[in-house]
Amino acid sequence: MGAFDVVVLGGGTAGVHVALEAARGSKSVALVEAGLIGGESPYLACLPSNSLLLSAARGEAWEDAAARRDDVTGGLDDSAAALRLIEAGVAVIRGTAQITGPGTVEVVSGAAAGEIVSLAYSDLVIATGSEPVAPPIEGLSDIPTWTTAEGLCSPDLPRRLIVLGGGPAGCELTQIYAAFGSQVTLVEAEPGLLPGEPAFAGEILATALRRAGAEIYLGSPATKAERTPDGLTLALEDGTRIDADRLLLATGRRPRLTGLGLDALGITVTPGQALPTTTSCQVLGPEHVWAAGDVTGSTHTHASRYQAGVVAANICGQPREADYTAIPRCVFTTPSVYAVGEPARPEFATARVSLSEVARGRLGLDDLGCLELYAADGVLAGAVAVGPDAATWMAEVTLAIRAKIPVSILADVVHAFPTYGEALQAAFRELARVDQTEKGIGPLSELGMETPEDDAIEQHTEVVADEVTTAGRRELPFDVDEADAAEQARSVGFDDDDYR
């Protein structure tokens, strides 16, 4: 029997990072994984999806995009990832693990034709990830289907594709295959795309996907699937019938916990439910048992990495708790979606800015984009943005929520012109104005701070000067009189509403 300070079950993002950090903390570590070291994210999910989306944006042919994707994912070769662990001192064991009791695990080796390896541990980390969930649709097992992983690593481009599920993965895959010429139909049982996010985000994304050529059915679940001579037919509850060559299932995932032997530790888990954990990522019940990643119900790669750091710190004697108030939620479509923190609530102050209201929004070809910020008691609580590369210019919001920075401070932050950050600037100032009004302090201008109206005039002035010059009508002086900005705008064909 091999004895280790730490045994990690699962070699995905969470498991790998726990193992590396624990090894750096002078712990002896064994990691058990039956599949790819590194998990699905770098091979079958996030990286191939983003690779294909970027190739689509560049206008590449499918063959070139697929080749680039395969290069990015290393051809599903995890030897480099395994070597990194080994060089860090981690014992990598290929096989399927089962907990046999407190402090012991048995591994059926995948490398030694079923040999059983016994391991002893002081701390156990469960990081076995998640698996796709197939919906209860009559006839589903009789038709050609893809999981999201199969859809992202396929060498083939289907002529007609149905994507079932309008969450982040379903929307990304819809845009990918529509961009490369497939006839794509997206079906979502809920009334809108991206269930759980504000309706405006799903509405904007639906508009973008329809413009890309996708057909979208909302609010009617699929009830029956039938194989046909040409492929398949999917029937919806409202009577709609859709023909396709293949059905891609993007209908969610569940924690992969079956067969682990959790009952040997006195842990009872409802099928499909996450492992209950403390804020220290310790599994409720037995001591020295930890969990990180999808098994906890947190389905984002960056959240898995964060939890792994919390687990490793606690195992190494450095008490740490996880704070989930600012975990980003991203959809890497065009336009992209970035959400963080709490959703809108009636008691929250809300600021909403269309990206077309800032100068940068007038420079792009995409007219779709909007930002909403939510604040409570003068502190930012949540945010949702839809727009070009939203994840890049919304990162400061994540920091603001995590650090509980007052909106009065955020409102005084200077953003470069012309950037989408100016949409944040306008929203911060609106939230600060509401906060000051509620506290009876007075307008921002009395505090020596620009108001949202001041900002709008400045944007109006700068854009008008730029547009007039670009139009070749006449050069305006560098110092444009703000009082004349609206009149000058009208003189070159702009309405006052263009900058509101």
How would you name each of these model-derived features?
Residues 2-16, 24, 198-200, 211, ...:
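Mid-to-C-terminal Rossmann-like scaffold of FAD/NAD(P)H-dependent oxidoreductases
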Residues 4-31, 170-179:
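N-terminal Rossmann-like FAD-binding beta1-loop-alpha1 element of flavoenzymes
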Residues 7-9, 23-42, 182-193:
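Glycine-rich FAD pyrophosphate-binding loop
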Residues 21, 40-121, 197-223, 344:
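N-terminal Rossmann-like dinucleotide/flavin-binding domain of flavoprotein oxidoreductases
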Residues 46, 128-183, 187, 215-216, ...:
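Glycine-rich dinucleotide-binding loop and its adjacent helix/turn
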Residues 71-78, 153, 158-162, 168-229, ...:
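Rossmann-like dinucleotide-binding cores of NAD(P)H-dependent redox enzymes
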Residues 91-94, 98-112, 119, 180-279, ...:
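A Rossmann-like FAD-binding core segment of flavoenzymes
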Residues 141-159, 241-314, 400, 411:
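FAD-site-proximal beta/loop scaffold in flavoenzymes
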